[in-house]
Structures are given as C-alpha cells and as structure tokens.
Amino acid sequence: STGSLGVDLALGVGGLPRGRVVEIFGPESSGKTTLCLEAIAQCQKNGGICAFIDAEHAFDPIYARKLGVKVEELYLSQPDTGEQALEICDTLVRSGGIDMVVVDSVAALVPKAEIEGEMGDSHVGLQARLMSQALRKLTGHIKRTNTLVVFINQIRMKIGVMFGSPETTTGGNALKFYASVRLDIRRTGQIKKGDDVIGNETKVKVIKNKVAPPFRQAEFDILYGEGISWEGELIDL
C-alpha cells in the first residue's frame, strides 16, 4: 500500500507492485518523498523490511517517524557517489531479505567521475549511462527476489521545445523503459486553516502501468508534519 487509498485504487492492484521498478516523479516539494515514506510505513506495518538510499542527504528521521516509519528498523544509507548508491541498491536486492528499497533521488546520483572532476568539465550522458547499466543489472535480481524498488525523480525543463511537453525527468530514458509503474505527483493547491497554510492539495497521475490499466488519477491532501490525510480521502471517496 502507498498509504493513500486513492493512489492504491488508481494503481489498480491495491498498491505498488512487488518485483518491479517504480518511478515517482514531480516538481520540488510536491510530496514525492512523503508518498514513499508513507509506503515504507505501510510495508513495515505488514512486517516488511525496508531500505532508504538517501542520495540527496536530506532524510529527516523526525518527519519520517511522524508518518509512522519505524526509523530504528529502517536500513538507511547515505552514499557519496551514484555508483555507490546503485551498488548498495543491487546488494540489498540480491540479498533477498529486503521487501522495499527507495532511492531518493535519481537526480542526486552523481557519477564518480563528475564528483572527482573539475567544476567546468563536461560530463555529458554519464548519469544516463550509469542508470541504464545499473537497471539492466538490477531488473533480473528484482524479479527473482520479488523486491519493490522505488526511484524518486525530479523534473527538468527541456530547452527549445516548440510542441509537446517541455518537461523531462533526469537520468536518461532507461528508467522510463524499465519502470513498470510511473507516478506523476503534483501540488495543486494549498490547504488553509484561517490564514495559515497547513498543507498541500496533491494530485497523482499514473502515467505508465504495466500491471493494471494506466492513466488513472487520485487526489489527496498532505498535511504538514502529519503526512497524507486519511479523513480527507475517505470523505472524498
């Protein structure tokens, strides 16, 4: 389960599918990490073991705890390079002892050559190559051990696009192909109590779904410091 009734329904299989790669992408502070932490909390509730690969070095244990994550039972890794992050992910998946791995985020998976290089050096296509190599290797292991791997991704603007959407996700095209489910998450409005903003209205679209019909959507509220609002969802549904 994702911790959101609406998203579980939109996914068509009652939650995120195991043994698959899932991509959750959206603009900054749209609720990507919140949705993943909610899913981790649900997985742990059912006795699952979860890992969080924090390439952004932005994991907040206090917030995670508020969302119901058992932080002391969570495998947390803060790798230095993209290679290291994906190697850790592969090792965790191959072990067969982990139910769910979250990688936060693809944009922060910086290749070693880029970290060690000079500021002005050109490293075109390095990250895309890294992702496609890693996913080729990972997919088989994921299927075999029935692990769920979630990649969080950011949105970038393509320059000079005349028609079609100018938005693209980072890390090349490999993830688009290898992901069985792709979720597009957006903040659509604010929730106010008097004059104070207490949360965000959020919309999730299932852009790609290989395990159920795609293009369904869900709307829910994320309250600051609390996570997804169950009551709000029940009323809406």
Swiss-Prot record:
ATP binds at residues 26-33. Transmembrane segments: none annotated. PROSITE patterns: RECA_1, RECA_2, RECA_3. One of its GO terms (biological process) is DNA recombination. The keyword Cytoplasm applies. GO terms for cellular component: cytosol. SUPFAM superfamilies: P-loop containing nucleoside triphosphate hydrolases. One of its GO terms (molecular function) is ATP hydrolysis activity. Keywords: ATP-binding, Cytoplasm, DNA damage, DNA recombination, DNA repair, DNA-binding, Nucleotide-binding, SOS response. It comes from the Bacteria. It is found in: Cytoplasm. Gene3D superfamilies: P-loop containing nucleotide triphosphate hydrolases (3.40.50.300). SMART domains: AAA (SM00382). Can catalyze the hydrolysis of ATP in the presence of single-stranded DNA, the ATP-dependent uptake of single-stranded DNA by duplex DNA, and the ATP-dependent hybridization of homologous single-stranded DNAs. It interacts with LexA causing its activation and leading to its autocatalytic cleavage. PANTHER family: MITOCHONDRIAL DNA REPAIR PROTEIN RECA HOMOLOG-RELATED (PTHR45900:SF1), RECA (PTHR45900). Belongs to the RecA family. This is Protein RecA. It comes from Neisseria perflava.
